[in-house]
């Protein structure tokens, strides 16, 4: 089982939803006067939009397909991923958001993460900008690819069309509104998509539980056929648990999430956004975990077959609801895919347009030209990600985990040290980025045969050690300590 029975209501809901997203892109097309408008929405995003946009762009199709699939296969042991992510997101909002917002707006007008690194360490040679830009492009191409795979699997299962055709349709929709609308379009669509995703992850598990005859009945069935799925620890090692919890480390280095902190309307909006964002996340993660866990019981009770565990949400949406509701629920997967891929495309395009073209190759480029370059970059990055996504057997979770580790190791430690340690230097930042990224790449290829731990763990540790060692053996550049003190004063002023 895996193909949805094609019907007019399902097709209608998909078309309506896609047209709504494209309309938002067209609406904001003429509102983008500057690169700050296009990339940060003129720093005018309120707490609700900032919170839900951060959540929706963070989770992607992984939330509705990858995570439920992992719980379906491995049970509660895989819920450690959700726990790690929740803790990481909370720490990110509480400790990183305010400081990064101050640094990128009050102290310096930084539009991109690479911008921030350059101004934070007074890097007049643009080395940090170039390294971070390369890291962003390399890992985001894989990350965007995971979203395109999710979208393709959705269209393939929904419409029964060939994978490559499904991939083309999903890519075209995502690229279109990102190309036109920029950051405001992405954030407003994220608001809609975030609410739709959470609603779907509340409704589907509840209806599943009702059809099973209650949670107790579902657990009873699982205990009979697959009891190991009910254990948080059984059948797993300490290394596996550490690997799952370590997903939380990735939050500190995700450019498409960090940029939400940079664009929020006011520093005083951060606490409210934190409550909204974490509440959305916890509810959505619980829903995804419950659906994946109880999916085993449902499939067994009603004598069904499921070829691809990552399609459990698609199958449940088809079986439990009428076609109109199914169309809405399946649009939630499209929403998840679109929200993340569009954010990542936008960050990638800003990297090419701002960090390469406008800073290195044409410093006097007019704003309109930079925006043209950024829109062309959206197309270019999407084409490369599309090519990688043509492997229909690729696991959504495995692609996401690789890119997540890459950003967490190369940027996460640098972001944390740069915001909390005034003694950190430009050389330390360079060493941290290079060692973190290279450790993830090399460990993924060669290290797992020695110790099968999630590559973000060694990557984050190596990067942190490199930052401390190289910073202690190099000097702090003029002005950086003063800027750090200014940031601390701004933080202190918020308490009064």
PLM features: what roles do these ranges have?
Residues 1-496:
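Membrane-embedded helix-loop-helix hairpins and adjacent transmembrane boundary segments
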């Amino acid at each position: 089982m895996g193909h949805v029975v094609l019907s007019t209501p399902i097709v209608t809901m998909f078309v309506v939803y896609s047209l709504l997203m494209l309309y938002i892109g067209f609406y904001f097309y003429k509102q983008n006067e500057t690169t700050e408008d296009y990339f940060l929405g003129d720093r005018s995003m309120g707490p609700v939009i900032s919170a839900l946009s951060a959540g929706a762009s963070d989770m992607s199709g992984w939330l509705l397909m990858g995570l439920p699939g992992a719980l379906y296969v491995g049970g509660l042991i895989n819920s450690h991923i959700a726990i790690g992510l929740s803790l990481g997101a909370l720490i990110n909002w509480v400790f990183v958001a305010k400081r990064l917002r101050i640094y990128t707006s009050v102290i310096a007008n930084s539009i991109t993460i690479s911008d921030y690194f350059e101004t934070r360490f007074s890097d007049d040679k643009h080395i940090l900008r170039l390294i971070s830009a390369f890291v962003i492009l390399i890992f985001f191409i894989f990350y965007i690819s995971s979203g395109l795979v999710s979208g393709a699997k959705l269209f393939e299962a929904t419409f029964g069309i060939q994978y490559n055709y499904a991939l083309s349709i999903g890519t075209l929709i995502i690229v279109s509104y990102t190309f036109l609308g920029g950051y405001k379009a992405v954030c407003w669509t994220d608001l809609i998509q975030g609410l739709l995703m959470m609603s779907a992850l509340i409704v589907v598990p509840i209806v599943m539980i009702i059809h099973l005859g209650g949670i107790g009945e579902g657990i009873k069935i699982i205990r009979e056929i697959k009891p190991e799925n009910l254990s948080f620890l059984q059948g797993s090692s300490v290394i596996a648990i550490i690997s799952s919890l370590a997903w939380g480390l990735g939050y500190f280095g995700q450019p498409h999430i960090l940029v939400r902190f940079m664009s929020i309307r006011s520093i005083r909006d951060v606490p409210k956004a934190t409550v909204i964002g974490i509440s959305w996340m916890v509810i959505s993660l619980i829903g995804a975990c419950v659906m994946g866990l109880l999916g085993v019981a449902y499939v067994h009770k009603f004598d069904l077959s499921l070829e691809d565990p990552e399609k459990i949400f698609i199958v449940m949406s088809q079986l439990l609801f009428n076609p109109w509701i199914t169309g809405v629920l399946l649009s939630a997967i499209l929403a998840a895919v679109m929200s993340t891929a569009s954010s990542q495309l936008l960050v990638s395009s800003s990297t090419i347009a701002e960090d390469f073209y406008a800073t290195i190759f044409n410093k006097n480029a007019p704003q309109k030209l930079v925006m043209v370059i950024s829109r062309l970059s959206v197309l270019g990055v999407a084409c490369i990600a599309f090519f990688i996504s043509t492997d229909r057997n690729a696991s959504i979770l495995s692609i996401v985990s690789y890119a997540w580790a890459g950003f967490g190791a190369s940027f996460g430690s640098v972001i944390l040290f740069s915001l909390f340690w005034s003694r950190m230097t430009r050389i330390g930042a360079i060493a941290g980025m290079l060692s973190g990224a290279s450790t993830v790449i090399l460990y993924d290829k060669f290290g797992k045969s020695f110790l099968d731990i999630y590559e973000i763990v060694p990557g984050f540790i190596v990067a942190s050690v490199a930052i401390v060692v190289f910073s202690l053996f190099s000097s702090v550049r003029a002005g950086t300590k003063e800027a750090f003190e200014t940031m601390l004063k701004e933080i202190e002023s918020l308490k009064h």
